[in-house]
Curated annotation (Swiss-Prot), chain A:
Protein name: WPP domain-containing protein 2
Keyword annotations: Cytoplasm, Golgi apparatus, Nucleus, Phosphoprotein
Location of the region described as WPP in the Swiss-Prot/TrEMBL record: 44-147
Keyword Phosphoprotein attached: yes
Tissue specificity field: Expressed in roots, stems, leaves and flowers.
Cystine crosslinks: none
Subunit structure: Binds to FPP proteins. Interacts with WAP, WIP1, WIP2 and WIP3 through its WPP domain. Interacts with WIT1 and HSP70-1.
Broad class of where this protein is predominantly found: nucleus
Amino acid composition bias (Polar residues), ranges on this chain: 27-36
From Swiss-Prot, chain B:
Top-level taxonomic group: Eukaryota
Free-text note regarding domains: The KASH domain, which contains a transmembrane domain, mediates the nuclear envelope targeting and is involved in the binding to the SUN proteins.
Parts of the chain that traverse the membrane: 460-480
Membrane in keyword set: yes
Keywords tagged on the record: Coiled coil, Membrane, Nucleus, Transmembrane, Transmembrane helix
Name of this chain's protein: WPP domain-interacting protein 1
Source species taxonomy: Eukaryota, Viridiplantae, Streptophyta, Embryophyta, Tracheophyta
Locus of motif Nuclear localization signal 2: 83-84
Domain KASH: 459-489
Tissue: Expressed in seedlings, roots, stems, leaves, and flowers.
GO CC annotations on file: cell plate; nuclear envelope; nuclear membrane
């Protein structure tokens, strides 16, 4: 009778320390899990940041405004400064050059943006953009040369312009034929 | 077939009798003319003529090889000496010479005449060799010679010399010599086969039957020849009967012939040997005829040769003309074609020159330089624009890369901070674990103390119970003595 009573007492006394230990263990694990979760979130953020610049870097088209401004400046320089065509067709003033360049760039950008291509890089669209600009440059230069011939004020300029007009007539006819 | 063979055998027996008589006559002639060489020639002729008669009647029934037939007949003979000679005869000539010596020793009674014949026979062999006779024929002829000696010795004992009979033999020889021209070597071979039938052996008959089937075509020719000879043999037999007159002698001779079949072979061989020179002469004449015919043919060919040559020449002369004409025509046509092609080439060259001039004019008129300049200008502008855009995009990329680098650096800093925090947390965790262990130890100690107290309490309780029980018992004991005191009163 006494031995059995002793055993029962022992069993009753044991539970409290186990409960205490379990509470301590749970307290220990919680901060580690929280820290791990924080690590995961940080990694995901880093991955997202890495992906974004990759997408941007791969695409050339559409260009940013700065690039378009750079193109305009280059066009103005080509129109205003001397070159093979300028020697042949004459140069323009800075103001006229700026206006003409803006028109050319806007028109070409519109055509290029309307065009659709399968390439994701935009290289083909860029080529089309450059071709449109070159065509419009030539057209504008020839038109200006013809206008100057019509508006000629100086005798020397008139003689040069007359020669230029004769030369221009041929290529104009050629262009028409080529277009046809 | 068997009946025919028997009849043929009987006929052969009759023929053998006649042959023996003629043989005896020949021996007499030999004795009278021992010294001269002409006597030997006459003996040869007689033997050949006699062999003719024997050969053809035998051929009627049994064609085939002589060698095969020759050996079994020898077995039937009674005398040992003859057996030895005949067996050896089939072998080479050297063996035959040895046999000749044996004959000399054996036959002492007729040594003189036999010796002479042997001497004369040896030159026969030489003559045959000079005559370019085949080796097979030499063997046969040599065998025949030795057989003749044996047969002559045997017959001389039974027959006596008769002048009348010699005269008749001469007449018969003349007739046979005339017939010998038609004879060929084949009857000799057939002659040996005939005795097989007389011997009466069954196995040989079977062989003969098989051979007959093979040689059917040949038999017809031989039958014709046999019929002609048969009539001649009958005439001869009639003549012999008239001159002999004695029936008893004829009957005795027949019996001897029937008893000994081997003698017939001997007589046949003897006649065949004498037959050889005539056959050789005839063969020589035939050869000469063949040679002459060949020469005649050659002359004919020579005479004919110029004709085809002329034809060939004519053909050669005629054939090239049309070929040459055709070739010349072809050459002319080809030359015309060449001229035409040359003219065409000149025309085409002129066209080419015109085209070249036109192309040059077109080039000058169109002014390719201006077009080239415009194209170059366009390419320049395109290149410039593309360059600008690419350069701008590269700048953007560089800037983005810088941003990315900054972000990476920030991330690294954050990682370091997080790692530091982790370290701190780990240290705290370690501390907590240590505390937990301490607490566990404390709990263990507490449990121990609790157990001890429980034991003490239980012990105290038990003691108190024991004391109470003792007290209760004492009280009960006090109550129980009162009823005892009342009872004694």
């Amino acid at each position: 009778m006494a031995e059995t009573a002793e055993t029962i007492n022992t069993t009753i006394s044991s539970p409290p320390p186990e409960s205490e230990s379990s509470t301590t263990i749970s307290a220990m694990t919680d901060p580690t899990s929280q820290e791990a979760a924080s690590k995961d979130t940080d990694l995901t953020k880093e991955a997202e940041s890495e992906k974004k610049p990759g997408g941007i870097s791969l695409r050339i088209w559409p260009p940013t405004q700065k690039t378009r401004d750079a193109v305009l400046n280059r066009l103005i320089e080509t129109l205003s400064t001397e070159s093979i065509l300028s020697k042949r067709y004459g140069t323009l003033k800075s103001d006229d050059a700026t206006t003409v360049a803006k028109l050319i760039e806007e028109e070409a950008y519109g055509v290029a943006s309307n065009a659709v291509s399968s390439d994701d890089d935009g290289i083909k669209i860029l080529e089309l953009y450059s071709k449109e600009i070159s065509k419009r440059m030539l057209e504008s230069v020839k038109a200006r040369s013809n206008a100057s011939v019509g508006n000629g004020s100086v005798e020397d300029a008139n003689t040069d312009a007359s020669e230029v007009s004769k030369d221009d007539a041929g290529p104009a006819s050629e262009e028409e034929k080529s277009e046809a | 077939m068997d009946l025919e063979s028997e009849s043929s055998a009987l006929e052969s027996v009759d023929d053998n009798v006649l042959i023996q008589q003629s043989a005896s006559n020949v021996c007499d002639d030999g004795r009278s003319l021992d010294n001269g060489s002409c006597s030997d020639e006459s003996v040869k002729l007689l033997s050949t003529s006699n062999s003719v008669e024997l050969g053809k009647p035998m051929s009627f029934d049994s064609p085939g090889d002589g060698g095969g037939a020759y050996s079994p007949v020898l077995k039937g003979q009674g005398l040992r000496k003859w057996r030895r000679i005949r067996r050896d005869l089939v072998k080479d000539t050297s063996a035959n010479m040895e046999n000749s010596k044996a004959l000399k020793r054996g036959l002492s009674g007729v040594a003189h005449s036999h010796g002479k014949q042997m001497q004369f026979q040896s030159p026969e062999v030489e003559q045959e060799s000079q005559g370019s006779v085949g080796s097979v024929n030499m063997l046969k002829s040599s065998g025949d010679g030795f057989d003749i000696l044996g047969s002559s010795g045997y017959d001389s004992r039974f027959v006596a010399g008769v002048g009348f009979s010699a005269g008749m033999d001469l007449e018969i020889d003349d007739d046979r010599s005339s017939k010998s021209s038609t004879v060929a070597r084949a009857p000799k071979v057939i002659r040996y086969e005939k005795p097989m039938i007389s011997s009466g052996q069954g196995g040989n008959i079977r062989v003969e039957n098989s051979k007959k089937h093979r040689g059917e075509s040949v038999d017809f020719e031989k039958e014709n020849s046999y019929s002609s000879l048969e009539s001649d043999s009958r005439k001869q037999s009639g003549r012999m009967m008239d001159y002999n007159g004695e029936n008893g002698e004829t009957s005795m001779r027949k019996d001897d012939a029937g008893g000994e079949g081997g003698e017939s072979i001997n007589t046949d061989n003897r006649y065949s040997d004498e037959m050889d020179p005539l056959t050789e002469a005839i063969n020589g004449f035939l050869a000469l005829q063949d040679a002459l015919e060949k020469e005649v043919q050659q002359f004919q060919e020579i005479g004919n040769e110029p004709m085809p040559q002329h034809h060939e020449q004519v053909s050669e002369a005629n054939s090239p003309h049309p070929e040459i004409v055709t070739l010349v025509n072809n050459v002319e046509q080809l030359e015309n074609m060449l001229e035409e092609t040359r003219s065409m080439l000149e025309v085409k060259e002129s066209h080419i020159r015109d085209l070249e001039s036109t192309t040059n004019q077109s080039k000058h008129s169109w002014g390719g330089t201006e077009i080239v300049v415009e194209d170059i200008f366009r390419q320049k502008i395109e290149a410039e624009i593309e360059y600008l855009i690419y350069s701008r995009s590269i700048d953007n990329l560089n800037s983005q890369m810088k941003l990315i680098d900054e972000q990476e650096s920030l991330a690294e800093e954050q990682t370091h901070e997080t790692l530091n925090k982790l370290g701190r947390v780990q240290t705290k965790a370690a501390n907590f674990t240590n505390r937990a262990q301490d607490l566990q130890n404390d709990c263990i100690e507490i449990t121990g103390t609790i157990k001890k107290r429980a034991c003490k309490i239980t012990s105290y309780v038990l003691i108190q119970l024991v004391l109470l029980s003792t007290v209760v018992l004492l009280l009960l004991s006090q109550l129980l003595p009162e009823p005892d005191t009342v009872v004694p009163t």
